[in-house]
Amino acid sequence: MGKFVEKLENAIRGYTFDDVLLIPQPTEVEPKDVDVSTQITPNVKLNIPILSAAMDTVTEWEMAVAMAREGGLGVIHRNMSIEEQVEQVKRVKRAERFIVEDVITIAPDETIDYALFLMEKHGIDGLPVVEEDRVVGIITKKDIAAREGRTVKELMTREVITVPESVDVEEALKIMMENRIDRLPVVNEDGKLVGLITMSDLVARKKYKNAVRNEKGELLVAAAVSPFDLRRAIELDRAGVDVIVVDTAHAHNLKAIKAMKEMRQKVSADFIVGNIANPKAVDDLTFADAVKVGIGPGSICTTRIVAGVGVPQITAIAMVADRAQEYGLYVIADGGIKYSGDIVKAIAAGADAVMLGNLLAGTKEAPGKEVIINGRKYKQYRGMGSLGAMMKGGAERYYQGGYMKTRKFVPEGVEGVVPYRGTVSEVLYQLVGGLKAGMGYVGARNIKELKEKGEFVIITSAGLRESHPHDIIITNEAPNYPLER
């Protein structure tokens, strides 16, 4: 028998989400009692096992803030300049700090126009007025409404209450409430400005109790880089990013691996590498903290059709997870998630968390443009391998950067729209609720037990049809089962 026939006879069978279900198990576990927190790197523990994709129609700073507040993690895409991406990371970090250390300030002799420019640029409503490192006033948007052309010192509030570096959250909140102020400068022993506490940050800390934060009280954030963009990784690391996500269509590329090893040594942030779909890749990526699994499962990806390469996602997750376990690496399943039940299946197959694109692209916080089609609201969504994304700068992800002219790009993705789905909070509520329900059915109290107790059954096409609503005309659309996909 020829070797080519042997290839076919020895080929493994690959399964994806629609090919499997989990078998119900005896349980005492109630969905409301399960713990959905998960570790995705040695230093990053999430309160929900969900990351937003590093795509230019999915994750910029607003999505990253929303994800972190709900207990997940946003990965800011790299289809922008280094300076822009660094600023995006900083905006996430500034969103909820207890004490903001890199305070944006202004001198008393500056114009009101410049004060407005700074506020709009950095997304803030007020500025400490500083002279020789000492606070001499506070200027806010309320102070300068319709008063262009004047100087800061003419309109600033001069009587400024300050606090020492030793102040705690409750004390700061009490001072601000008693004095009816929303900004509290922090000064050192010499009276020099070293930080700023804002009422909005304190309120957010109490409102978003499930948020993931570092020891400074800052929201966690990740950012994507090319394996060959060392400067970008270093600048993001300096900006305080918590996780560097090396973002390439095929991470098991030997040139990329050499570059990633060098990058790993020069950044202190935790390090995730993707994407892969072959357990052999794990052997060469042991320098990473986690690997990201998925070659072509995304709704906007055409890699499997254009290149003929990929592994159905459930099988890819399982194969990679088995190998990753040997090295103590974490696994993130990236792509192909259509319903909350798919998240349950991905984790049961070995993933520690999932990355979502399509399901989050239609949210208010996603950067895609809103469009109206036949009276219904949609948001633009495109693959990073689509022609539009490649023209903007994403070609390198598919090893088509530099030498290829725009008209010669070979896209591995498409562009389109998805239905508007409301806020990130609303979408995640349904997804996490479905995950908790699935854990209850299999008797899993936490993510670890879901991996251990989840048993699969392979289903037929008839089984899949039976799994969905059938023999009915649906008149009221459920929030977790959209009629239009």
Swiss-Prot record:
State which pathway it belongs to: Purine metabolism; XMP biosynthesis via de novo pathway; XMP from IMP: step 1/1
Q: What catalytic activity does the UniProt entry give for this protein? A: IMP + NAD(+) + H2O = XMP + NADH + H(+)
Identify which top EC class this enzyme belongs to. Answer: oxidoreductase
Relay the activity regulation note. Mycophenolic acid (MPA) is a non-competitive inhibitor that prevents formation of the closed enzyme conformation by binding to the same site as the amobile flap. In contrast, mizoribine monophosphate (MZP) is a competitive inhibitor that induces the closed conformation. MPA is a potent inhibitor of mammalian IMPDHs but a poor inhibitor of the bacterial enzymes. MZP is a more potent inhibitor of bacterial IMPDH.
| One example GO MF annotation | metal ion binding
Question: Cross-referenced Pfam families, in alphabetical order?
Answer: CBS (PF00571), IMPDH (PF00478)
Q: Which residues bind IMP?
A: 299, 334-336, 357-358, 381-385, 412
Q: Where does NAD(+) bind?
A: 247, 294-296
Q: Does the keyword field hold Heme?
A: no
Alphabetized InterPro entries for the sequence: Aldolase_TIM, CBS_dom, CBS_dom_sf, IMP_DH, IMP_DH/GMP_Rdtase_CS, IMP_DH_GMPRt
Kindly list the cofactors needed: K(+)
User: Which parts of the sequence bind K(+)?
Assistant: 296, 298, 301, 466-468
**Gene Ontology terms: biological process:** GMP biosynthetic process; GTP biosynthetic process
Enzyme Commission designation = 1.1.1.205
Q: Which residues form the active site?
A: 301, 397
Summary of the function given for this chain in its UniProt record: Catalyzes the conversion of inosine 5'-phosphate (IMP) to xanthosine 5'-phosphate (XMP), the first committed and rate-limiting step in the de novo synthesis of guanine nucleotides, and therefore plays an important role in the regulation of cell growth.
The record describes its quaternary structure and partners as: Homotetramer.
Put simply, this protein is called: Inosine-5'-monophosphate dehydrogenase
Organism expressing this protein natively:
Pyrococcus furiosus (strain ATCC 43587 / DSM 3638 / JCM 8422 / Vc1)
